[in-house]
Amino acid sequence: MLIETLSVFPEMFEPVMSTSILGRARKAGLFDFKAYNLRDWTHDRHRTVDDEPYGGGQGMLMKVEPIAEAIEAISAEGPKPTVVFFTPCGEPFTQHVAERLLKASACCLCAAVTKVSTSVPMRMPTSACRSAITCSRRRASRYGRCRCRRTPDPGALGDEMSNVDESFSTAEDGGLLEYAQYTRPAEFNGEGVPPVLVSGDHAKVDAWRRKNAIERTCRWRPDLIETARLTPEERAYAQVILDASYSQSEE
């Protein structure tokens, strides 16, 4: 089995893959590992992998072109891998999913601090979020706890406001999943950016984002709706979506 990672910090993974249980399994030939640098598939002087989101807002988004080129190049080197993209909006990454991936090569797209344009998952065979899996000595979960505790600290991020409306944040979005975000190009492989995000009308952009956040939360994490801070109108809209989803599941 071949495990691959695609990120802007490939040096992070080699120590993990060479230590403890993973290290022994790798030495025994149970799996092979490669870490790719996403910047190797950029074509500008600064090796840029991210850009500002359409519609404005804090933070940056990883661009789709370098990722698409990287996946195509990696696939050409050997068996086409299942691409695993970790996101709050996706199939729960359970132990069952992890075991299923053992049957094929897997390439994990790691976004680090920068988020990924919504255009990217449209090309992915698999999307998943971190959830119930078995980890040796819980190192991975401890790392995750350190990240979530220290990320809000002043100076940890280039723009401190970029953490405000993230998924699960209780500051601005009321505990909803984050709305879909897009960055350049405006169209990629026939998939375009929602026109409202390039309209320049900030009020309409804010309204679209709020509605989209509710829709995404209803689809992927309906359990969050009960505790989310919603207006009566928003809660009624969410209930319509949930009722429709329940009716479809019953058919």
Question: Residue locations for each model-derived region?
Answer:
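Hydrophobic/aromatic beta-strand patches that form the interior of the parallel beta-sheet core
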Residues: 4-6, 34-36, 84, 107-108, ...
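Active-site glycine-centered loops adjacent to acidic/histidine catalytic or metal-binding residues
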Residues: 9, 112, 133
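A short aromatic-anchored loop/beta-hairpin motif
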Residues: 43-46, 50, 54-68
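Long, charged alpha-helical interface segments
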Residues: 172-228
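Structured adenosyl-cofactor binding patch, chiefly the S-adenosyl-L-methionine
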Residues: 117, 121-159, 163-165, 170-171, ...
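N-terminus-biased detector of the onset of the functional/mature region
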Residues: 211, 215-251
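Glycine-rich, flexible N-terminal cofactor/catalytic loop recognition
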Residues: 2-40
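S-adenosyl-L-methionine/SAH cofactor-binding core of RNA-modifying enzymes
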Residues: 61-113, 118, 155
